[in-house]
């Protein structure tokens, strides 16, 4: 394969992640990743490894280790945000001190490519790119890594809209990944 990605559905199993308005983050992230898988499965150019495809909880270390073991070109973690009930919007997290891909792609550049696709799919407020150097998966994954926060589960209307559009977000995950590989080929 010329392109290798690790796709991570945040939380899972005993770790529900954010819970609000009758929804659980772990279920939403899993459905998004499962939807993305249906697109990746039809693409012979990209090999995708998944940290989970069911309601299990891989540790944060296991998630990073998977990417490191398979020599991934990209690590893509999908999450749902939570804050006060009025918080709104889509943001994508990168690590300015994180590793680059083998071709020199930074966490910032990878995040900057995918963010508009996710934001466009949600239609939510654009919270932009946020530098987070302390997150385990963005710190220990030895390639270009990103973590996208689709929207706020703590916001009632946003949670409801997310729940009915998870498949669309999965498609955006796929399309944004394709765009990144077009823009920054792997050299494999």
Show which residues each predicted segment covers.
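Active-site-adjacent mobile loop/cap segments within catalytic or ligand-binding domains
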Residues: 77-84, 93, 126-188
């Amino acid at each position: 394969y010329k392109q290798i990605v690790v796709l991570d559905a945040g939380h899972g199993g005993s770790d529900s992640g954010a819970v609000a308005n009758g929804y659980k983050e772990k279920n939403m992230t899993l459905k998004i990743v499962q939807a993305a898988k249906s697109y990746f499965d039809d693409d012979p150019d990209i090999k995708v490894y998944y940290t989970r495809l069911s309601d299990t909880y891989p540790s944060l270390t296991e998630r990073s280790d998977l990417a490191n073991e398979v020599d991934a070109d990209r690590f893509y973690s999908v999450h749902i945000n939570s804050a006060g009930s009025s918080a709104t919007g889509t943001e994508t997290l990168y690590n300015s001190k994180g590793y680059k891909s083998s071709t020199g792609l930074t966490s910032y550049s990878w995040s900057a490519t995918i963010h508009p696709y996710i934001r466009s799919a949600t239609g939510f407020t654009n919270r932009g790119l946020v530098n987070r150097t302390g997150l385990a998966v963005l710190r220990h994954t030895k390639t270009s890594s990103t973590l996208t926060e689709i929207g706020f589960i703590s916001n009632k209307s946003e949670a409801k809209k997310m729940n009915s559009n998870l498949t669309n977000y999965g498609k955006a995950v796929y399309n944004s990944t394709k765009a990144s590989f077009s823009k920054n080929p792997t050299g494999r």
